[in-house]
Amino acid sequence: MFSLHFIDEAFNEVYAGNGGHGIVAFRREKYVPFGGPAGGNGGNGGSVIFVGEQGETTLLKLKYQKHLKASHGFNGKNKSQNGANAPHLYVKVPLGTVFFTMDNHFLGEILHHQETLVIAKGGKGGRGNKALANFKNPAPSYAEKGDLGEHFKIKIQLKVLADVGLLGFPSVGKSSLISLISKAQPKIDSYPFTTLFPHLGVVLIDGFSFVIADLPGLIPNAHLGQGLGIQFLKHIERCRVLVHLISMQSLDPYKDYVALNKELQQYNSTLVEKKQIIVANKMDLPDAEKKLKDLQKKLSDVTIIPLSLINFYNIEKLKYAIKNLLQKTPFVIPKHDNFKVYDLNSETQTFTINKNKEGVFVVSGRQVEIFSHRTDFNNEAAVKRFNYLLKKIGIEEALKQKGAKLGDQVKICNYLFDFVI
């Protein structure tokens, strides 16, 4: 059951930890005149990882905890001691939580208990001079700085995970129905918008169980934000089956049916393709039979289940109808474009070179940024290695092809260099 503080959207800033720096050190022992390099590697920075938790029902904590920061990795030490990796920051979220960048680029979602999703990856620790030693340079006098951890803003949405969604305009009897067929105890009254947030209930029938959600009532133009609007329309996307309640107290039940489906269509056209069970509620009222017959004539190709919650009429029939339809309707995980996949060993070699208005050649690219962040520019040997790495991946030749000449300025990240052939 959700609390009065049900929050289904939050905006947060994630900070993964930076990698620790490798260090320059040499073995200093008596009777060992040429001990060689002994600088340890830096530890990896902590990542920001979200974890699905079945007991969580709201994003309330994230609503007020705007900044999610993981720790930095520890620096390496002498005597070949590596710095410790930083612990990851684990954040518990409800099942059905979806993550986006601020420009709505899909990052991932969590659907299962204890499922994890790395949103911001911690920086890799820099190598010490012992790890950088090779046959060409057996005693390097430089080390690598740790990589920066990822840092950006995200939008988090909770889309309720329920098998069945109860739909209808305000006061059609959704809350009363879910309280009768499950153990949910929503607030029930006769005024519109009694339900201000989704209520979940579990229905058991012949050893089969399903989760049903009482969603806040819709009104015309809900897809434009009228009433509770889009705030809760998104929860319908997860449901496999929709139970559409129509009140026989309405002046025109058919008009209500058409209007609600129009709202679904205008919000997301795929919603009207979901399996629906049409329920004519409040059959105990005068003229209900006449209105039901008129509705059946206009919806001749649709089975309508008449229902009276006061008289408990057809409640069991509805439960079995939902069960049978669910057994024929498999759960389909929504597809998202641009899914973010982490390759922990990926350091793409692509780069771009552009000449700005000031005549400066600007070099950008993921691997170039990594080289830059790992280099200690106060260390002459480290700068020489930086130049060697740029030449190795073809940047020097690419600059020549772009027309760079001796003495021209080249900008890499926040550093300006003079081009030397």
Swiss-Prot record:
Main subcellular location of this protein, as a coarse class:
cytoplasm
Enzyme Commission designation: 3.6.5.-
In terms of Pfam families, this protein maps to:
DUF1967, GTP1_OBG, MMR_HSR1
Instruction: Establish whether keyword Metal-binding is in the entry.
Output: yes
Indicate the segments forming the Obg domain, all copies. 4-161
Any idea which UniProt keywords this protein has?
Cytoplasm, GTP-binding, Hydrolase, Magnesium, Metal-binding, Nucleotide-binding
All residue ranges annotated as the OCT domain in the record: 343-421
Q: Name any Gene Ontology BP term.
A: ribosome biogenesis
Q: Name one GO cellular component term.
A: cytoplasm
**Annotated GO MF terms:** GTP binding; GTPase activity; magnesium ion binding
Q: Does the keyword Magnesium apply?
A: yes
- List, alphabetically, the SUPFAM superfamilies matched: Obg GTP-binding protein C-terminal domain (SSF102741), Obg GTP-binding protein N-terminal domain (SSF82051), P-loop containing nucleoside triphosphate hydrolases (SSF52540)
Tell me the residue numbers annotated for binding GTP.
Answer: 168-175, 193-197, 214-217, 281-284, 308-310
Task: Specify the enzyme's EC class, one word.
Answer: hydrolase
The OBG-type G domain covers 162-327
Location in the cell = Cytoplasm
UniProt xrefs under HAMAP family: GTPase_Obg
Q: What is said about its interaction partners and assembly?
A: Monomer.
Question: What PANTHER family would the database entry show?
Answer: DEVELOPMENTALLY REGULATED GTP-BINDING PROTEIN-RELATED, MITOCHONDRIAL RIBOSOME-ASSOCIATED GTPASE 2
Q: State the function annotated in the UniProt record.
A: An essential GTPase which binds GTP, GDP and possibly (p)ppGpp with moderate affinity, with high nucleotide exchange rates and a fairly low GTP hydrolysis rate. Plays a role in control of the cell cycle, stress response, ribosome biogenesis and in those bacteria that undergo differentiation, in morphogenesis control.
Describe the family membership recorded for this protein in Swiss-Prot or TrEMBL: Belongs to the TRAFAC class OBG-HflX-like GTPase superfamily. OBG GTPase family.
This protein is called GTPase Obg
Its source organism is Phytoplasma australiense
Encoding gene, per UniProt annotation: obg
